[in-house]
Amino acid sequence: MNQKIAAYGSWQSPITAATLAQAGRRFVSLQCSGDAVYWVELRPLEGGRYVIVRRAPDGTTTDVTPKGYNARTLVHEYGGGMAAFDEGTVYFSNFTDQALYRQDGAETPARITPTPLTPLAQRYADGRITPDGKSLVYVREIHLDDGTVINEIVVLPADGSSEPAVIASGYDFYSNPRISPDGKWLAWLCWNHPMMPWDGTELWVAPLETDSSLGSARRTAGGPQESIFQPEWSPENILHFVSDRSNWWNLYREIEGEIEVLAPMAAEFGEPQWVFGKSRYTFLRSGHIACIYKQGGFDYLGVIEPGKASVTSIPCAFTSMSSLSTDGTALWLIGASPTQGPTVLRINPTDGRIQEIQRAAEIDVNPLYISTPEAIEFPTEHDKTAHAFYYAPTNPDYAAPDDELPPLLVITHGGPTSATGAQLSLTTQYWTSRGFGV
């Protein structure tokens, strides 16, 4: 191909402002339940409504959330964990009133939490259903008229026949109430202001009594200097969790009061918990633990075999992954790559075969115009090392003069933990295809 010689920054590109403005859905979260897979979509063309979608075993997809409902919670303001699933029954928080609703199949959702005197004063998130299907355990956030905000864990009947009862309180923040498969134990995370969950959290465990009250609770892990992420119970009722006690978020488990690391490595199995419902590991029927871990800014997929202290990687072209779940044998997740936007994926953990189920948007851009990231690092103040992705100018139609360097756009993240991900950004490609480095 004959390339035109033109200055960096002056190249013509097929990626236009109109390309960037194309409205596409966004996948918020995903979870397997029974023989179905559910995910939540944010739909800009429906006014930013959050819609729960169900994929049946035969591959058909159905919108679960009816028009007029919006499956979104405002607990901790950032939300997440807006839905819980029990076979064909869905429980979700509704954005307009922040109440909890129960929806059986295609029936109209029924409100199961009381109406507060002040609108939006009671909010619910991150719920789980007891194994017998009779009770729900949720994080509840109450906003008082004087501005005081109270977080607590509550239990309520699945049919909403009585009001929620508080079973854990006293800390400023709660998350991740998780019920053991045998229904006998409850684990949860909590922390106090001014700590953030990536600074220090506490993991607590208590017996879950037959009347849904809690027995004597004990702190299992965590504290002001230890961040705990995603506590989960294995099918054998063994508590697992991610901890940064080694300065890396690694996976641990507790057996008979002893805590042991499963696969120590210089990688992050956790991430900052801005929202509820994050999932970066799950349990397969084979006894393996499937996991997502981050190294050098890229996400990788792997499995930990029973009795082994290492992770076996699963080859995967997707480098940004979230919401890892399983139907028992296959892995389900939301994945993206430098050349492809978010996609619902089904992955065979044995041979790594990937099936694309649903793309967030169909992007009609020739891959030759796509710049892929190079992980770089450089020294910064206080003898620290900064990390970044570099996207080089990329356009098959142009080349720059040999003695010229490209203009560089430097995009810094906002907030204390925000970071770029290794996934397609048309905004980045808009500039790189015109001869800018980013």
Regions found by a protein language model. Name each.
Residues 2-7, 278-362:
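N-terminal targeting or regulatory segments adjacent to alpha/beta-hydrolase or S9 domains
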Residues 5-55, 72-82:
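Beta-strand-rich domains and repeat architectures in extracellular enzymes and scaffolds
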Residues 14-21, 62-73, 110-118, 163-168, ...:
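A short beta-strand motif characteristic of beta-propeller blades
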Residues 23-35, 70-90, 119-135, 170-186, ...:
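Conserved beta-propeller blade repeats
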Residues 37, 50-52, 83, 98-102, ...:
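Hydrophobic beta-strand positions in blades of beta-propellers and related beta-sheet-rich domains
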Residues 41-51, 71-77, 92-100, 116-124, ...:
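A flexible loop/linker signature enriched in serine peptidases of the S9 family
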Residues 56-59, 104-108, 157-160, 208-211, ...:
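Short loop/turn segments that connect beta-strands within beta-propeller blades
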Residues 232, 236, 322-438:
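Serine-hydrolase catalytic core recognition
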